[in-house]
């Protein structure tokens, strides 16, 4: 087997790191939410996030490499700009993080020269992200309505989208430096 491209291993390690941090965010939500339906959905969502981290770990191992420790990943960079303190903020951040994961994986599907196994992982995690975005958004809107102002949900999402745009721009610049404009 040919040695894996270290740039690809680094990129897949970033994906793995994002999924692990996503699981951590869901653990916070599990502790904050008493709603039985939310507890069921959060448990499945947490299962998905840790499974995604495992799928990236396995893909890296199958390529003959080891996952890299990522110290400047997406959620670490978001955390340097803000720490959500309310349930609405954590839900809004989760919506934005899931949207970013979905769009990032979609982009990877079209821009990188993917082998069959990497394509399979990308398709599997992308499919799960659709449900993650939908149910968290609905729960966020429901809680905002219960608190008397649904517009709080959209305002929180917009707040985190602005932070996401800054963070993603920096990560994208790094990816362009590594892979070049045509792939990144």
Set out the residue ranges of the language-model regions:
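Non-heme di-metal
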Residues: 1-184
């Amino acid at each position: 087997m040919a040695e894996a491209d270290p740039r690809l291993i680094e990129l897949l390690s970033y994906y793995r790191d994002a999924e692990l941090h996503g699981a951590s965010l869901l653990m916070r939500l599990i502790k904050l939410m008493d709603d039985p339906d939310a507890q069921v959905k959060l448990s499945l969502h947490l299962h998905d996030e840790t499974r995604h981290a495992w799928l990236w770990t396995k893909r890296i191992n199958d390529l003959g490499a080891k996952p890299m420790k990522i110290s400047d990943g997406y959620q670490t960079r978001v955390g340097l700009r803000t720490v959500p303190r309310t349930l609405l903020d954590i839900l809004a951040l989760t919506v934005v993080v899931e949207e970013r994961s979905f769009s990032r994986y979609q982009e990877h599907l079209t821009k990188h020269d993917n082998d069959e196994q990497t394509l399979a992982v990308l398709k599997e995690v992308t499919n799960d992200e659709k449900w993650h975005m939908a149910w968290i958004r609905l729960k966020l809107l429901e809680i905002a309505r219960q608190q008397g102002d649904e517009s709080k949900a959209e305002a929180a999402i917009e707040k985190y989208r602005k932070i996401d745009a800054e963070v993603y721009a920096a990560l994208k610049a790094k990816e362009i430096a590594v892979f070049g404009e045509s792939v990144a």
